[in-house]
């Protein structure tokens, strides 16, 4: 098993980041995301907003991986999210549904307010494991997956930044959040 970890500080307040999460796709940095479908949404007894979504992605995979997975390039990911307004956290749990009998990818992302700044802390961990049928190639597959995950995570953060910027500019029309001067 390999683990990918990442931390980032979004220069926007938690309320804006958590609201923007629902508008994250599509964006120009995540063109591999084809569709995001909401399967379930409800407020739990403890007041937490629970949402389950199906994310459809088109992966550009190397030929040697395509041979291992029978040539399928579209994959499905299950995302469950928990928005806890009292604790001021947004937690996302994602797992791949496609190829999960060969390669398991479980990701946890948490957004929470920075304790001192008007910003939001992003923490990400992905556990990637090639399963028994792939043991001979597991290290190679896991490392390739971690490297690819890191690249997509970086583009994902860039894409989310652009979504936040667009929302910020449309909400505050003449000046970005936190700016003291108006823009033309």
UniProtKB/Swiss-Prot annotation:
<keyword id="KW-0472">Membrane</keyword>
<comment type="similarity">
    <text>Belongs to the slowmo family.</text>
</comment>
<dbReference type="GO" id="GO:0005758">
    <property type="term" value="C:mitochondrial intermembrane space"/>
</dbReference>
<feature type="domain" description="PRELI/MSF1">
    <location>
        <begin position="1"/>
        <end position="172"/>
    </location>
</feature>
<dbReference type="GO" id="GO:0045332">
    <property type="term" value="P:phospholipid translocation"/>
</dbReference>
<dbReference type="GO" id="GO:0005737">
    <property type="term" value="C:cytoplasm"/>
</dbReference>
<comment type="function">
    <text>Required for mitochondrial morphology. May control phospholipid metabolism in the mitochondrial intermembrane space.</text>
</comment>
<dbReference type="GO" id="GO:1990050">
    <property type="term" value="F:phosphatidic acid transfer activity"/>
</dbReference>
<dbReference type="InterPro" id="IPR006797">
    <property type="entry name" value="PRELI/MSF1_dom"/>
</dbReference>
<keyword id="KW-0963">Cytoplasm</keyword>
<dbReference type="GO" id="GO:0015914">
    <property type="term" value="P:phospholipid transport"/>
</dbReference>
<keyword id="KW-0999">Mitochondrion inner membrane</keyword>
<dbReference type="InterPro" id="IPR037365">
    <property type="entry name" value="Slowmo/Ups"/>
</dbReference>
<dbReference type="GO" id="GO:0007006">
    <property type="term" value="P:mitochondrial membrane organization"/>
</dbReference>
<dbReference type="Pfam" id="PF04707">
    <property type="entry name" value="PRELI"/>
</dbReference>
<dbReference type="GO" id="GO:0031314">
    <property type="term" value="C:extrinsic component of mitochondrial inner membrane"/>
</dbReference>
<keyword id="KW-0496">Mitochondrion</keyword>
<protein>
    <recommendedName>
        <fullName>UPS-like protein C36.10</fullName>
    </recommendedName>
</protein>
């Amino acid at each position: 098993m390999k683990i990918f970890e990442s931390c980032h500080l979004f220069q926007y307040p938690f309320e804006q980041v958590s609201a923007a999460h629902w508008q994250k796709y599509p964006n120009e940095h995540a063109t591999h995301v084809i569709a995001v479908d909401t399967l379930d949404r409800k407020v739990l007894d403890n007041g937490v907003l629970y949402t389950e979504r199906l994310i459809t992605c088109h992966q550009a995979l190397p030929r040697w991986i395509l041979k291992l997975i029978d040539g399928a390039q579209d994959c499905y990911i299950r995302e469950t999210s928990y928005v806890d307004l009292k604790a001021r956290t947004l937690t996302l749990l994602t797992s791949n549904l496609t190829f999960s009998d060969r390669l398991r990818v479980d990701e946890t992302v948490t957004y929470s307010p920075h304790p001192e700044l008007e910003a939001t802390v992003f923490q990400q961990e992905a556990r990637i494991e090639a399963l028994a049928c792939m043991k001979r190639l597991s290290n190679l597959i896991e490392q390739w997956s971690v490297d690819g995950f890191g690249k997509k995570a970086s583009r994902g953060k860039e894409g989310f930044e652009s979504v936040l910027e667009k929302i910020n500019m449309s909400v505050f029309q003449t000046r970005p959040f936190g700016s003291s001067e108006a823009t033309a």
